């Protein structure tokens, strides 16, 4: 039990910090008709030009971060949905920041999502037709809160057949000040 008491008048400010650790291993990928993988990259910006840095799992607060998802499926699959769970400590980019990325938002037309929806806990990337054997869209975030976090797996599959899905492994991400 934690008890906080106050005596006297005036402004009162309290701060509490809680850490919780599970003694469980990281989530391993689930594959079936599909396979999903995810990599994190720092995004380098020089003027109005953006480039992908090396894959890594440690970032500094304020850094622009890209996740590249890879959904492997049978060529010709239709109505695919990939969901990238927003890692704790990160924020999705604003619409203006996202627009500044221009063509860097996707790698070729085949990997351009038909729709992108940003929700509180995930970014959903949809594709209507798979012209190759994989769909590799990108999602962008900003590292905000320092800490060490376990990122939930990305998941994907057919929109209208929810039993056909796969998910990636979970990742451990570190954000420093």
Question: What is the predicted role of each segment?
Answer:
Residues 1-177:
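Long, domain-scale non-catalytic interaction/scaffolding regions in large secretory-pathway
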